[in-house]
Swiss-Prot record:
Enzyme class per UniProt: oxidoreductase
Coiled coil ranges: none
Co-factor: note: Binds 1 FAD per subunit.
EC assignment: 1.3.7.11
Identification of the protein by name: Digeranylgeranylglycerophospholipid reductase
Pfam family name, one: GGR_cat
Amino acid sequence: MKSKYDVLIIGGGPAGALAARTAAQKGLSVCLVEKRPAIGAPVRCAEGIGKEALAEFIPPNPRWISAEMTGAGIVAPDGFEMTLESSMAGGKVGYILDRKVFDRELVWQAADAGADVYVKTRASSPIMSEGRLKGAVLDYCGSSSKVTADVVIAADGVESKFGKWCGIDTTVPVREIMSSVQYVMTDIDINPGATIFYLGNEVAPEGYLWVFPKGKRAANVGIGISGRKSGKGHRAKDYLDKFVKQKFPHGKTIECIVGGVSVCRPLECTVADHLMLVGDAARVVDPLTGGGIYNAMYTGKLAAEVAADCIAKGDLSKKALMIYDREWRASKMGKSIERNYHIKEYLIKQPDEKLNTIIHSVSKLDLKEFSTLTLIKELLKANPKLLVELGALAASIR
């Protein structure tokens, strides 16, 4: 391990990998460190991503695609299922990835581009000089090394500590952390081409339950509920076990994954002098769906591009790096996060009866395409009273 790099990236998930690949392709010296002993494991993700979203960063490869989705379903609290055909999304729905293989592919590409990669390497503290970040102390194979860098990109996930160490408030309120559990199950009867979402306060309070196929008779079956709704006897696992017992009584669980997902607004600021936060560390997960793969790759790539420009200009100050923060907030992704946060806040306050009404109403709409924005617009046309309930959000998208 060298003692000096242009860019030091902490975290080997999709955000860190795209940052490393992009920076290396631009000719910068790059060090990517991952605290776990293997890239891509353990998987803490439902593994879904849209086709067009994926293609923006990497061509699809059967090696790391578990299943191709051609539709989706949303199940209301009363059991009514609304079906969404692929034609509503222009025939471009999405994939269920094999994240263990996918994440490694991204990091391999970063390494091929010239990035140095170290696993089982933890950033234990920042190196500060005159109040400015200069790098990090890395614990690697039983010893500590000081590595300096012109800029550090923190891609250290939902548990991100590095930003906090550098003075950025990364605290997430308990109510905005989803407590999540997922089983990888086999020998279950499913529609192998459709992702299914279950809503309702009896099924998943202030959250949802999902079935994401990974083959003809295999799927990720998981749940995310609000942290404030979790407690003894009503943990996320308790709700999931009840669902599995009813829906897949003869299914076999071959893996159990637990974790937390932030469904809050993004951090107030995602940069400091010589520092940028990306992906889950920046809290850019979609607050409505909990999805974060695309947002992670987008912010990782953008951060590296801005870093390269700022290094070339010799200015890594917070003011110079703010172009990254401004650009992702102004992007389609950033606007979607803000809109979906308001939708999420609206939906979690609704009783099951209201959720039933909304889903039944949507099922009757003549949707030519399906997206969150289209859905809300059509709902407002069909239910003008929602204008008052949705308030500023409704006004902003009319």
